[in-house]
Amino acid sequence: MNGLSTLLERASARRHALSRDELVALLGLADPGEIAALRAAAYAVKVRHSGRLVSLRGIIEMGNVCAKDCYYCGIRKGNDCVGRFELDEEAVLRAVRRNIDLRYGSLVLQSGEIASEKHTAFIERILRKIDELGGGAIGVTLSLGEQSEETYARWRAAGAHRYLLRIETSSPELYAKLHPADHSFERRVDCLRLLRKCGYQVGSGVMSGLPGQTLDDLAGDILFFRDLDL
């Protein structure tokens, strides 16, 4: 435990203090006491940076039509067993008003990935209406998949503040096993950079427990988030 205590103290005191091997060691802890110590150290860092607060966001699921065919996803294009839906503008704005009435200060607009001028303009209208309804006080996060730089810029100009685009895994090899050949890991990473370029606060994420995933893969995910400042 002494070695672990020293490692946790260093990690808590200085950002980006851990090597890949040290991250693998922490991810592989099995002793209940050591796991509790790790959780306590992580919670202390969380409290130091963001306090003992819980932030609530209203999520509006606008549709489950998606151009992607990711093997793990229930709304993948090739899944013929799921009923498809797309909310119209009136339904989305009704949900927006409901969230405003509940005094949510942050909204997430989420759907499957659609790349078309019609969809881009639809989201633009929704964003401008949210700004109008909320008096500019509502933070808006989009989770709408991979898009062009022009589309990202248009949505940012219309009032979006944040964007969530999960990388799913930072391992190109593991990514390739989870997606068809026409799904590009490099394109995914490039979209994260484009979002930052367009002025978004960018969020991402990974899946844990994937078949074939290793602790080294998970350590790589943490370093990926560090390197891209996510």
Q: Which residues does each PLM region occupy?
A:
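Conserved, mostly hydrophobic/aromatic
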Residues: R15, A42, C70, L165, ...
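Core AdoMet radical
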Residues: K77-V92, N99-I123, L127-L192, Q201-S208
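N-terminal pre-triad scaffold of radical SAM enzymes
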Residues: R39-K77, R84-Q110, H161
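Residues at alpha-helix caps and immediate loop-helix transition turns in enzyme cores, especially N-
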Residues: L38, H119-I123, T214-L218
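Catalytic cores of alpha/beta
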Residues: S148-W155, P211-R226
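Short, intrinsically disordered, charge-balanced linker/junction segments flanking boundaries
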Residues: R10, L223-L230
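Flexible, acidic/Gly-rich N-terminal and inter-domain linker regions that tether
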Residues: M1-K68
